[in-house]
Amino acid sequence: MPSHLIKSGISKAPHRSLLKALGITDNELKRPFIGVVHSFSEIVPGHVHLRTVVEAVKAGVRTAGGVPFELPVIGVCDGIAMNHEGMKYSLASRELIADSVEVMVKAHQFDALVFVPNCDKIVPGMLIAAMRLNLPAIFVSGGPMLAGRVRGKSVSLSNVFEGVGAVAAGLMSEEELLEYENYACPGCGSCAGMFTANSMNCLTEAIGMALPGNGTIPAVYAERLRLAKLSGEKVMELLSQNIRPRDIFTRESLLNGLAVDMALGCSTNTVLHLAAVAYEAGVEFDLNLVNEVSERTPNLCRLSPAGPHHMEDLYFAGGIPAVMKELSKKGLIREDLLTVSGKTVGENLKNAVNKNPEVIRPIDNPYSETGGLAILFGTLAPRGAVVKKSAVLPEMLTHTGPARVFDSEEDATTAILTGQIKKGDVVVIRYEGPKGGPGMREMLTPTSALAGMGLDKDVALITDGRFSGATRGAAIGHVSPEGYEGGPIALVREGDLIKIDIPGQRLDLLVSEEELNQRKARLQIPEPKIKEGYLARYQKLVSSANLGAVFLK
């Protein structure tokens, strides 16, 4: 075992002395050392309770004969980081998390790992680390926040963001917005809709890297602590059987994850993160695969922001096992694959039941015959762009309109909130990609403003940046190549017609090739916005969104 490198033999007496300074006994030195990697902090609602979850994990590890050690990593709250320079650091933190886990694990030679993430970039950051290190590992998240209630209606953070736009449009009073502010987020956990954090926690379960229940058991339920204890016990079984992440995360389990992604209508960020995890694991992935899976996978759920349901509703309906059970009825799930439970997918699904067909539509009565996400290609996005089509109103699935061009999120948001955007417009926000931002910010504030003002049925928004999982409407992101790399989005001018055809998977700039070539010859890329610190280094290393915005090997 790796830990023998720090505790066995005469030459390791100094190492053992330091371990004994921690209170480790001679008996414990004979046992496996288990790293419990978590992202507790007091500034992130999704993480503020993780110490309690971690204590349960450690209890499970000890029960099964291991010695647990906590390893904290950073974690950004995307909601608090939204719409200012802090959002530039969100996606960039994913690579920092993966690298820091690698450093701690290699330096201290753990035998196996339990990962305890919860929010947006922490989950994929830890998944990347798990694939890179390939030590026996299991995930158990902190769990979703319960929905809030305002005037008898279930609500979440997305309602507060949209409320800002509603106030600007005169559709809501400031007093009513304050009510949403006070009650939309009732306590700890990842925000209550099918936003990025919950999407990734559900997909971690779907690909077999977490036990059933990981994605949906509410943060405040004792069942979450029981799951954490069981995960601590299970990692010892994985260690004894030498089952490693790359044994579980294969191309076939990736396809299972994508199928669940389409059925749930997950965040567009899942495409970025699954691509990154697959790259680290050596599993083939390209954007065409997303469309292939989407074409054959029905959309069964419409959770917030696409519909009225929240994560607790999905939990009570049977959770991810119930969704996978529905998909398996049409052969859309590979059931013979290994999971961290020690059982196959099929064995995990044996007793799964869809307890609420209003929350999880039966496979023969889906919301749509195709999945919740689509990849668009065309003259504006030669290497692809992504849209959460399950959150797009029917009248905006196809749309042609004049471009309103902005070189930053702030400029676009100001224009929207001051009434400068009209029905039919296509808002274009560029130079917000992985390199151009740098950091590929989420455009939740402008999309929420449009939705809150009632313009989501008339206005589209296109960007080389990203969107929050809380975004709804005709919001098309990850446009590749990005503007900073001279992609066509950098050539768009005010008033150019843009054609969106989501069913046809097309995104086109209706400008002649001759004109575009002339514009490209005169194009001047803006100077880097940040020239020092971590983001300056990140900008030099990060790849395009269609590759997962990874650091290429």
Curated annotation (Swiss-Prot):
Keyword Iron-sulfur: yes
The record's free-text note on cofactor binding: Binds 1 [2Fe-2S] cluster per subunit. This cluster acts as a Lewis acid cofactor.
Modified sites of kind N6-carboxylysine: K121
Enzymatic reactions: (2R)-2,3-dihydroxy-3-methylbutanoate = 3-methyl-2-oxobutanoate + H2O; (2R,3R)-2,3-dihydroxy-3-methylpentanoate = (S)-3-methyl-2-oxopentanoate + H2O
Cellular compartments per GO CC: cytosol
Keywords, sorted A to Z: 2Fe-2S, Amino-acid biosynthesis, Branched-chain amino acid biosynthesis, Iron, Iron-sulfur, Lyase, Magnesium, Metal-binding
Family: Belongs to the IlvD/Edd family.
Keyword Zinc (UniProt): no
One Pfam family named in its UniProt record: ILV_EDD_C
Amino acids binding Mg(2+): D78, D120, K121, E442
GO biological process, one term: isoleucine biosynthetic process
Needed cofactors: [2Fe-2S] cluster; Mg(2+)
PANTHER family referenced in this protein's UniProt entry, alphabetically: D-XYLONATE DEHYDRATASE, D-XYLONATE DEHYDRATASE YAGF-RELATED
The name this protein goes by in its record: Dihydroxy-acid dehydratase
Documented EC number(s): 4.2.1.9
Function field: Functions in the biosynthesis of branched-chain amino acids. Catalyzes the dehydration of (2R,3R)-2,3-dihydroxy-3-methylpentanoate (2,3-dihydroxy-3-methylvalerate) into 2-oxo-3-methylpentanoate (2-oxo-3-methylvalerate) and of (2R)-2,3-dihydroxy-3-methylbutanoate (2,3-dihydroxyisovalerate) into 2-oxo-3-methylbutanoate (2-oxoisovalerate), the penultimate precursor to L-isoleucine and L-valine, respectively.
NCBIfam families in the record: ilvD, PRK00911.1
Residues reported in the UniProt entry to bind [2Fe-2S] cluster: C119, C191
Matches recorded under PROSITE patterns: ILVD_EDD_1 (PS00886), ILVD_EDD_2 (PS00887)
EC category name: lyase
Record-annotated active site: S468
Any one Gene Ontology molecular-function term assigned to this protein's record: dihydroxy-acid dehydratase activity
Pathway in which the depicted protein is active: Amino-acid biosynthesis; L-isoleucine biosynthesis; L-isoleucine from 2-oxobutanoate: step 3/4; Amino-acid biosynthesis; L-valine biosynthesis; L-valine from pyruvate: step 3/4
Oligomer and partners: Homodimer.
